[in-house]
Design a protein with these regions (language model features):
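C-terminal outer-membrane beta-barrel translocator/porin domains of Gram-negative envelope proteins
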Residues: 284, 364-368, 490-684, 689-755
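Gram-negative/organellar outer-membrane beta-barrel architecture
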Residues: 176, 287, 307-549, 639-640, ...
């Protein structure tokens, strides 16, 4: 490897004598755009959109462009130097160097600024700037073989629409158009924009096709504009072409509907069966998919008017099943007579391969210093039960060891199996069938995307040698649906988790007896949960969108309500279901994000995350499962600290010396607010400056209740260090860690939420970061610096953190934080 690196380094050094040696005579090396200047520019949303399109048409990357920038470049591009040195030489090494590492020079003649100027001027005119002009000039470098390009854009007057008239359409079409004018994309006073005019023409075409005019096309209509009647404005006429085909002038109805299924595209159809008014052809003894499922996915029915929206919905629903490799809708007139108004539909479906096999490898780590590999092996089957279902089963195994050389290694294994149905399965939903109104007509149940029902069961086994073997069995039934492009829903009427230990050692039993918080965390428990999530995102056309997600969940309340009938009190502790204690709580979490576009490419984002959990009823010491508690810190929260390094409230980390007890830094109340400015630096590279504030709190003395009798626990732990007899196993307990818990207990009163101390309890950090947009993924690097911590640090004033000491963290992540 070193040999190849040395060869490449020497090759670059030899070639570094010139970056223009490969530039032919009479041409120049293009080194980027010098600047793009604008005259008569009036800032508004329309002009900003035009400006963005203008700069795209003028952009051209030089050799060594930094992150796709047209203006910033590396002064000595290695690829160009290698190409100059070896492109004209013979021999295998020279050809390998040129093809593998070289890149030919970007010449001024190839960039062709004259052509780009012409294209940019057409962009101006297509956006209504008919009097605009674009010019360019060559900016010479001190090296005559190098040059940059400077562009000048004189936008001129923006032409607008003075009036709009729809003329020349048949009576039926004209009636539909006039009724739909409130939905028109163009209005009096709007800019004369070709893109908007085209969208209106497509709207009219889709409107007519959705009302039976199957053969109507956008090209059957056109615009006429009078730009002389009113100076600087256009009087617009939208009308139908005179000589359109006769079949595009009248409505069409759906006739026969035939569906043919094939496993391979060349398979022959040997069996045909009828279901209601649907004809299904296939090969074999029975249809590969149940006819009722086929009918529920088709919105085009016999003897009904053709509807383009129903056509698109049918395509989307059939493809969304994920079981076909090809889907083809064919519409054919029943005969060739002039009076024919019936279209027969033939749907050809070719099935995809039924099975997928996958293997995944992962590296796992935890905040308590354990790390290890994980392997996942799975199998998926499409159309598992002839209803478009997807069946999946996966097995996983992992091993983790203590990085500091301790004896806390463990291994984990388990499986997960799930079935996803491409419809809602519930007694109160009635599948995806249409509902009947009181007057006997059908009321469509429309969804923006195909709704799904997920059934999942998993089992996970953790084996800690010398301590315990614990099983966690989880079952879930979840609905997902989306009625509009902006709103999504997810409802899980039951998420059941059962945790129990198969085997425990004497060593672990003594540890439980000594530490009550370990006893609670590891006790056998049942968590019967219900959860609902609503997500809203603004339409993509909004310049300053919002995103909002709220989740409400509860556990144990329905069971406790049912036990009232058997004489159990609501607040009675330690009630069991089938001899298993169950959890009881209410939990609410909401997440809100608002984005403002600042200038052309920069954004300002604010983010708010709030959470509240209330534990009561059947819970031991008013505690909930540890996985349900809130925590802060990490790459998407308070970026000045790693996860679980802040809170609750003004808890001092020096009170808790053992990092294995970091999970205690949690709360039942959570509040985080973030402010982040994301400017584009150049190309696809963006910067970030952010400010984060937040914390977690307890709504009561939760951990004090959990760690009650801690002094006795410490005494037991210290006594357990000395074996009672040679046959008694030694318990690995660190008395110093237990004393740190005593210190922690002393602070718990201040861990409770208080409006009076809210200003001081909020941990605050700032920071900077980089974001690189690869198109399909965003890479992110953040450096968070603490400004204020809610506990005493020995520093006076509000800014008491150590931003260049322990209160700083670097995060590398994929995707934006919010």
């Amino acid at each position: 490897m070193r040999k190849y690196i040395s060869i490449l380094a020497m090759a670059c050094l030899m070639a570094a004598c010139s970056t223009t040696s490969g530039v032919p005579d009479g041409d120049q090396l293009y080194t980027g755009v010098d600047k793009i200047s604008y005259e008569n520019y009036e800032p508004n949303q329309h002009a900003d959109q035009m400006k963005e399109e203008m700069e795209i048409s003028l952009a051209a990357e030089p050799n060594g462009a930094l992150f796709g920038s047209s203006s910033l470049r590396f002064p000595f591009p290695p690829n160009l130097l290698i190409w100059n040195a070896y492109h004209d030489k013979e021999g295998g090494f020279a050809k390998w160097m040129t093809s593998s590492f070289g890149k030919e020079p970007v010449l001024m003649s190839r960039v062709n600024p004259e052509l780009r100027t012409t294209v940019a001027q057409s962009v101006l005119r297509s956006h209504g700037y008919f009097n605009g002009q674009v010019s360019h000039s060559i900016v010479q470098s001190h090296n005559p073989k190098k040059a940059r390009i400077s562009y000048l854009v004189n936008m001129g007057h923006l032409w607008t629409l003075d009036s709009i008239a729809y003329v020349g359409f048949p009576l039926g079409c004209d009636t539909l158009i006039q009724q739909s004018l409130p939905l028109a994309n163009i209005h009096k006073g709007d800019p004369f924009d070709v893109t908007t005019l085209s969208s209106e023409r497509n709207r009219i075409s889709n409107l007519l096709r959705s009302n039976g005019y199957y053969y109507f096309q956008p090209s059957y209509s056109y615009y006429l504009a009078d730009t002389l009647a009113v100076p600087g404005k256009a009087q617009l006429r939208f009308q139908m072409v005179d000589d359109i085909p006769e079949q595009a002038r009248h409505r069409w109805y759906i006739g026969k509907v035939n569906v043919e299924f094939r496993k391979r595209i060349m398979d022959r159809i040997d069996t045909v069966t009828n279901y209601r008014r649907l004809s299904i052809g296939f090969s074999g003894k029975r249809p590969p998919i149940r006819p009722r499922v086929v009918l529920s996915n088709l919105r085009l029915r016999p003897n009904r008017l053709y509807n383009y929206e129903n056509h698109l919905e049918s395509i989307e629903k059939v493809n969304a099943m994920g079981i076909y490799s090809m889907v083809d809708f064919q519409f054919t007139p029943r005969d060739t007579t002039a009076t024919c108004d019936t279209l027969d539909l033939k749907l050809n479906c070719v099935f995809d391969k039924p099975y997928d096999f996958y293997i995944e490898t992962r590296a796992t780590g935890s905040s308590v210093g354990r790390m290890g590999p994980e392997l996942v092996v799975g199998l998926s089957k499409r159309n598992a039960f002839r209803g478009g279902e997807k069946f999946d089963i996966a097995f996983h195994g992992s091993y983790a060891w203590q990085l500091n050389g301790g004896h806390n290694n463990y291994y984990e294994y388990g499986f997960e199996t799930s079935v996803e149905f491409p419809r809602l399965i519930a007694p109160f939903m009635g599948g995806n069938r249409d509902r009947i109104r009181r007057d006997g007509t059908r009321r469509r149940r429309r969804f923006f995307t195909t709704p799904t029902t997920l059934a999942r069961i998993s089992n996970n086994v953790i084996n800690r040698p010398g301590y315990f073997n614990m099983n966690t069995i989880t079952g879930e039934w979840t609905y997902k649906w989306q009625r509009t492009p902006t709103s999504r829903f997810q409802f899980s009427p039951i998420i059941l988790q059962y945790q129990f230990k198969n085997r425990v050692s004497d060593k672990f039993t003594r540890l439980q007896d000594s530490l009550l918080y370990v006893s609670y965390m590891m006790e056998d428990k049942l968590v019967p949960q219900m959860r609902f999530t609503y997500t809203y995102t603004s339409p993509s056309s909004y310049r300053n969108p919002i995103a909002w997600e709220t989740t409400i969940s509860e556990a144990g309340n329905l069971i406790s309500a049912g036990m009232l009938a058997f004489g159990k009190k609501w607040n009675e502790k330690n009630k069991n279901l089938y001899k298993i204690p169950y959890a009881q709580f209410l939990k609410l979490e909401t997440d809100f994000t608002k984005t403002w576009h600042v200038g052309d490419y920069s954004t300002l984002v604010t983010h708010l995350n709030l959470g509240l959990m209330y534990t009561y009823g059947n819970n031991f010491s008013d505690t909930a499962p540890f996985s349900e508690y809130f925590y802060v810190g990490g790459a998407t929260s308070l970026r000045g600290w790693s996860a679980r390094n802040i809170g609750p409230a003004d808890f001092d980390p020096d009170w808790l010396d053992n990092r294995t007890l970091r999970y205690l830094r949690m709360g039942t109340i959570k509040g985080v607010i973030n402010l982040e400015y994301r400017p584009r630096l150049f190309g696809n590279l963006y910067g970030a400056v952010f400010l984060d504030a937040g914390n977690v709190w307890m709504h009561h003395n939760l951990l004090h209740n959990l760690l009650v009798n801690i002094e006795d626990a410490v005494s037991d732990a210290e006594a357990a260090v000395v074996p009672e007899s040679p046959d008694t196993p030694e318990i690995e307990i660190d008395p110093e860690a237990e004393r740190s818990v005593i210190n922690f207990l002393g602070s718990l009163d201040r861990g409770k939420f208080s409006f009076r101390r809210l200003g001081n309890d909020l941990a605050v950090n700032t920071g900077i970061g980089l974001r690189y947009d690869l198109g399909f993924i965003m890479l992110r690097l953040d450096w968070g610096l603490g400004l204020h911590v809610p506990y005493e640090t020995g520093k006076s004033g509000y800014f008491n953190a150590s931003p260049f000491g322990r209160d700083q963290t670097i995060h590398f992540a994929v995707g934006l934080p919010f």
